[in-house]
Amino acid sequence: MTGREPDDIVGTFWQRKEKQVVNPLSRRGERQSNSYLKAGILLDEISNYCMISDIQAWKKEGTPHAGMNGFCQEGDCVQVPLSILAKWGKIDCLNKKLYIVENPSIFAAICEKKKGTCACMCMNGQPRLASILLLDLAAQAGIRICYAGDFDPEGLLITQKVIQYYKGEAEYWHMTVEDYEQSRSEEKISEKRLAMLERITDERLLPVAERIRELGVAGYQERLIEKYIDLK
């Protein structure tokens, strides 16, 4: 639990201003988002969305969100825009566990194979404000997140940022050296991009970061599809 009131639940987002990038998980980004939300301004509320499945939601006044309950009953995934998420005050999911993946095709496969049996979310690149709002609600609900990121410098950095940001229990999901070895491709990573791995500080990610640096190639999540579907 974060101890914050629903109106104070804010995330962070990427914003380009005067050619400077605001980190979506930085304090500066959070302050900016907080100011906009308190003013009732939703930035890019249509294209700013998150993709989720099997998550129940309640509005800030305490009434269930009928639409989300319907999607849960059908076991279908749904793309929820920021304008809807901003009205939520609470969420919950099966077994208090939320599986998060980067790749939309992996998300779709999990939703199809595990329909109605587990909650899942697709981050799909840099975290949008909508995704961060959902993470804040998940933390308040005592939900544990299991995060599977991409096996390249950008993917590892996003994974680390999300885990560090999350206020509840969190774990890296299939992010080991063994997983990378199984997923690796022939796609070369430039030296400039490999240098980004120096910013990996979480001890749990250091082994895979070092292996990616040694081999200099990216890994494809699609090659781990059976592991993701197994949900272990």
Question: Which stretches of residues belong to each language-model region?
Answer:
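Structural alpha-beta junctions
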Residues: 165-171
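Acidic beta-strand-to-loop metal/phosphate-binding motif
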Residues: 142-152
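Hydrophobic/aromatic beta-strand patches that form the interior of the parallel beta-sheet core
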Residues: 99, 121, 146-148, 171-173
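Nucleic-acid enzyme cleavage-core boundary/entry regions
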Residues: 1-122, 127-140, 154, 161, ...
